[in-house]
Regions:
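C-terminal lid/capping helical subdomain adjacent to the catalytic/cofactor pocket in oxidative enzymes
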Residues: 6, 500-550
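N-terminal export signals
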Residues: 42, 47-70
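N-terminal glycine-rich phosphate/pyrophosphate-binding loop and immediately adjacent elements
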Residues: 72-198, 352
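Catalytic cores of eukaryotic secretory-pathway lumenal/extracellular enzymes that build
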Residues: 120, 124-127, 131-137, 141, ...
Length: 550
């Protein structure tokens, strides 16, 4: 969904005013900088609160630590740690500017959390182990799709006419129209808070009494205090379930601002959207991993090292960085003039960066940023019962419920065929409960635990969708990225108090060590778009540093 142009201009001026105040600049100076680098103030937002203050608030760290003559006699040495979409797009952006880099990836393949399953299902259907959705406003991912001649499937366009989500709470259906009516009781205050308080970041200039109050309130308590009937109401239970699986942690651990900044900005249509403007509309035909594979193919083969696990990073007296890797060929040492760290903070916090020269706030963000514990159970069915008329109405494949699985969607939307691929997605304690499979990415064929979970899910789903249990074909997969050593979480999530503590600082560079990944994105946290845009941003920092030095 696209935001109102007038409202966005107002928000842009609010952001610029706060940036000017925080950095002792004039409003015109901030707007001139934004004109030179437009994404600073006008980047489309997933959660509708664009707060990329980090790059400017950390202005003291933006200076190139190496002398101006450092690269006149040799090319700069640029190391990118992590071969997910952030690292790959950083390398591609650098290559477009004529700069070479080397990616060091810990696993055996590139892609990070973007890897598809195109072989397990019938009728050439594809599912995603992790990263799945591309929104209408995800311009960076869409640009990569266009650049490499790939095709997007419009999943919303493919849904049957007049189909709706199935809402099922307290063992009864909760109509979408009733949810809209119930939402009216909280919509005005929610919209007021979202408009008046954003952005809320580590910068004290954004710390208004109510934003600080809401940041230190849990999402659970926000529901109890603001939704009539709290968790005893269908709307309260709906919001709790939806935001547990959306952010990946139980609502008693999340900042209330997660709900305010996502649900508070509704699309311009008259319909109520539980996730605000995020429409989760597209996926790539043939699998989303066609994007990282296409980028890798466009880079020199020798520029990607796989199975290189970073053990430590240290800043050298001359301003360069020394990196130590465990590799199949033993320990290897790399010296770099610039480093882009794209690995999740959940992984970085377990590595040795004590000598990297990071400041206290960066260390706090690395050590404490929350990460979701989502699990994704993918279950194929012999037909798409949910699209038929039933006691649930006419479904689009999505369930929101207080049953253990929280949420489903139809991963086969837009793909021809009779059979369907249903995804059950759960976060928080419910996600952690699916922990019996030994591998973080397992199938029913090799893991009896996955088959057990599939049966349990279908038995529960038979309540809102009678008859679904009998349509299972016996296959299933389970993704638990919080168990994967190179991920240790589904995606980042701001916990209670973390907006005001360090939100917006995750991507602030530390000398010539740059940071990228979805966890650095204030606009697209948790999305592939967040990784892609942050990779390009970190690369652009290096390009800007090196202008005139080559």
């Amino acid at each position: 969904m696209q935001r109102s142009r007038k409202l966005e201009e107002l928000r842009r001026l609010v952001r610029a005013t706060r940036l000017a105040r925080a950095n002792r600049m004039t409003l015109n100076e901030v707007l001139e900088q934004a004109a030179e680098r437009p994404h600073r103030l006008t980047e489309p937002s997933r959660r509708r609160f664009v707060k990329d203050l980090g790059a400017i608030a950390g202005a003291g760290l933006l200076l190139n630590n190496l002398p101006a003559h450092a690269f006149r006699s040799r090319p700069p040495r640029i190391a990118i740690v992590g071969g997910g979409i952030a690292g790959l797009n950083a390398a591609l952006t650098l290559q477009d500017a004529g700069l070479a880099s080397t990616i060091y990836e810990a696993s055996s393949v590139v892609g990070g959390r973007i890897h598809s399953n195109a072989t397990a299902w019938e009728e050439n259907q594809t599912s995603e182990w992790c990263g799945e959705f591309i929104d209408s406003g995800h311009t960076c991912m869409q640009a990569l799709v266009n650049r490499f001649g790939l095709t997007l499937v419009d999943e919303l366009e493919a849904e049957p006419t007049q189909s709706t989500d199935t809402l099922f709470f307290f063992e009864q259906y909760y109509g979408v129209k009733q949810a809209f009516l119930d939402f009216q009781a909280i919509s005005d205050r929610l919209e007021e808070d979202a408009n008046n308080l954003f952005p809320t970041t580590f910068d004290p200039a954004t710390h208004f009494p109510r934003s600080v109050h809401l940041d230190h309130m849990s999402a659970y308590d926000w529901i109890e205090n603001n939704v009539p009937g709290g968790h005893r109401s269908s709307l309260g239970s709906y919001i709790d379930s939806a935001y547990t699986n959306e952010f990946g942690l139980d609502t008693d651990r999340q900042s209330a601002l997660n709900v305010v900044y996502e649900m508070g900005f509704q699309p311009e249509s008259s319909e109520f959207s539980i996730y605000g403007e995020s429409d989760q509309r597209f996926h790539v035909l043939g699998g989303n991993d066609r994007i990282p594979f296409a980028i890798a193919e466009a880079l020199p083969k020798e520029s990607i090292e796989t199975e290189w696990w970073m053990e430590s990073i240290a800043k050298q007296p001359d301003g360069t960085f020394g990196l130590t890797f465990f590799t199949p060929h033993g320990i290897r040492y790399v010296t770099a003039d610039h480093v882009i760290l794209t690995i999740p903070f959940s992984v970085l916090r377990g590595l040795d960066y004590r000598k990297a020269g990071f400041d206290t706030l960066k260390d706090t963000a690395i050590q404490h940023l929350g990460y979701g514990t989502n699990s994704k159970l993918t279950v194929p069915c012999t037909n798409r019962l949910w699209n038929e008329h039933g006691p649930w109405g006419k479904g689009d494949g999505s369930i929101y419920t207080d049953l253990f699985f929280q949420n489903t969607w139809d991963s086969s939307r837009g793909i021809p065929g009779k059979a369907g691929v249903l995804v059950a997605f759960m976060g928080g304690a419910a996600g952690l409960a699916l922990d019996a499979a030994q591998s973080p990415f397992a199938s029913a064929e090799t893991s009896p635990e996955v088959a057990m979970y599939a049966k349990h899910f279908l038995r529960a789903a038979n309540h809102p969708w009678p008859g679904i249990e009998s349509l299972w074909n016996g296959r299933a997969t389970l993704s638990t990225p919080w168990k994967a050593p190179n991920l240790l979480g589904s995606y980042s999530c701001w916990k209670v108090g973390q907006y005001t503590a360090f939100s917006g600082y995750e991507g602030v560079r530390q000398g010539n060590c740059h940071f990228a990944g979805e966890h650095c994105s204030n606009s697209f946290q948790g999305f592939m778009e967040g990784g892609a845009t942050e990779g390009a941003r970190a690369a652009q920092e290096i390009i800007s540093d090196l202008e005139g030095n080559l």
